[in-house]
Amino acid sequence: MNEWYAKNLGLETSEYGTTFEWRHADDPAKTGSTSWCAFPQDTKYFNPSGKPFMINYRVENLVELVAELKKENVTIVDEIAEYDYGKFVHILDPEGNIIELWEPKNE
C-alpha cells in the first residue's frame, strides 16, 4: 500500500507512516502534526472496532484521562502501555470506532 501512495501521490513513508507538521493559523508559533499510516487490509490492529481506520489523539496526563473516561463508562480496550516514545491506550467511541490516545514523552 505504501508503494502505491509513493508512486501515485508522491507520499514517502517509513514503516510507521509519515507525519505532516503544521502551524496554528491564529498562533503560528504553535505547531501540531497529523500522522498517516497505511495498514494491511487484514490487520487486527483496529480490533475490536471492525472498522478499517483508527483515530489517534495526542493527550496530556493519560493516566488521569483514563480514570475520568472510566467514570464516564467509556469502553477502555486495553491497559496503558508505555514505550520509549510515550504512553498509549485504546478506547471505543459510542459508534464503535477505535481511538488511540497517545501521551508523547517529554511534551
Label each region the model flagged.
Residues 1-37:
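Core segments of cupin and vicinal oxygen chelate
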Residues 3, 7-17, 43-107:
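Vicinal oxygen chelate
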Residues 22, 41, 82-85:
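Generic structural "secondary-structure junction" signal
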Residues 35-41, 74:
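Short amphipathic beta-strand starts and helix->beta connectors
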Residues 31, 49-50, 83:
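A generic fold-level signal
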Residues 40-44, 105-107:
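A short, sequence-level motif marking secondary-structure junctions
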